[in-house]
Amino acid sequence: MDAILNYRSEDTEDYYTLLGCDELSSVEQILAEFKVRALECHPDKHPENPKAVETFQKLQKAKEILTNEESRARYDHWRRSQMSMPFQQWEALNDSVKTSMHWVVRGKKDLMLEESDKTHTTKMENEECNEQRERKKEELASTAEKTEQKEPKPLEKSVSPQNSDSSGFADVNGWHLRFRWSKDAPSELLRKFRNYEI
């Protein structure tokens, strides 16, 4: 209880400050900052400094907590709640105890930039897809108009009206003449389809 009452936040407890990162930093940024700091204060480079080992261990612990999604979420919750106890002690508490503590938690920092690169590239890809769809619709409309112009007019019945049995037969045979495949050069749309460009 005395530890909680006499608790003072130390800079070593703030893992983001220790690594020189921000709470919005990605895992890659955290790892890059860790490597830089670890090279600066590695115990092998400073054997005469007794605090080098302690500092390096703190850096490793900060890296382990901040690169793991679950532990980072717990750390961020603890940090924003401004609990007056060390993070290790907070971690040791049972989940039921944590939920019974009704502390107001500050919200996460807002992003300085509105969109990330991924969001921007996704929007650009969607716009390109929409443009391609519009082009395809226009091509389909133009090819449909061309086929309507080329399509022969329906054949008149070549069978005399006297022979009623053969008129049905003539319609069946004439069907393929009305809806036959065009022997013209394939359209641009058909070429793209065959080459898997669509």
Swiss-Prot record:
Effect after changing A62E: In HPANBH4; likely pathogenic
Outcome of substituting W103C: In HPANBH4; likely pathogenic
Record SMART domains: DnaJ
Classification via CDD domains: DnaJ (cd06257)
UniProt note on tissues of expression: Expressed at high levels in brain, heart, and testis, and at reduced levels in kidney and stomach.
Presence of keyword Disulfide bond: no
A cellular component term, taken from the record's GO annotations: cytoplasm
SUPFAM superfamilies xref list: Chaperone J-domain
Alphabetized UniProt keyword annotations: Acetylation, Chaperone, Cytoplasm, Disease variant, Phosphoprotein
J domain residues: 14-79
Induction remarks: Up-regulated by ER stress.
Gene3D superfamilies, A to Z: DnaJ domain (1.10.287.110)
Disordered: annotated span: 114-169
Segments of skewed composition (Basic and acidic residues): 114-156
Function field: Probable co-chaperone that participates in the proper folding of biopterin-dependent aromatic amino acid hydroxylases, which include phenylalanine-4-hydroxylase (PAH), tyrosine 3-monooxygenase (TH) and peripheral and neuronal tryptophan hydroxylases (TPH1 and TPH2).
Record note on quaternary structure: Interacts with HSPA8. Interacts with TPH1. Interacts with TPH2.
Record's protein name: DnaJ homolog subfamily C member 12
Source species of the chain: Homo sapiens (Human)
